[in-house]
From Swiss-Prot:
The lineage of its organism: Bacteria, Bacillati, Cyanobacteriota, Cyanophyceae, Oscillatoriophycideae. It holds the Pfam family Ribosomal_S10. GO terms for molecular function: structural constituent of ribosome; tRNA binding. This is Small ribosomal subunit protein uS10. SMART domains: Ribosomal_S10. The keyword Kinase does not apply. It comes from Gloeothece citriformis (strain PCC 7424).
Length: 105
């Protein structure tokens, strides 16, 4: 019995700026919908919060510290039944430099 394997592209996006990430997701979903592919998402994943603790004084005061944090926002978009037009359109898509994109076929 042969199973019907469905083609799928999974796109994982990461960024420090949430607004940049959301506009990139909108562009990807619009591009997929224009080429008659089915786009599911963007699905928000948990935000990673990284806190750095730094001494304020270069010399002795260990009691005085400062905290900095970075937040990494993540999204997943699944594109089902992509055609060659879909892949070409996604490759030509101009996205901001602050967004990390990972594509799995």
């Amino acid at each position: 019995m042969a199973t019907l394997q469905q083609q799928k592209i999974r796109i994982r996006l990461k960024a420090f700026d949430r607004r940049l990430l959301d506009t990139s997701c909108e562009k990807i979903v619009d591009t997929a919908n224009r080429t008659n592919a089915t786009a599911i998402g963007p699905i928000p994943l948990p935000t990673k919060r990284r806190v750095y603790c730094v001494l304020r004084s270069p010399h002795v005061d260990k009691d005085s510290r400062e905290h900095f944090e970075t937040r990494t926002h993540r999204r997943i978009i699944d594109i089902y039944q992509p055609s060659s037009k879909t892949i070409d359109a996604l490759m030509k898509l101009d996205l901001p430099a602050g967004v990390d994109i990972e594509v799995k076929l």
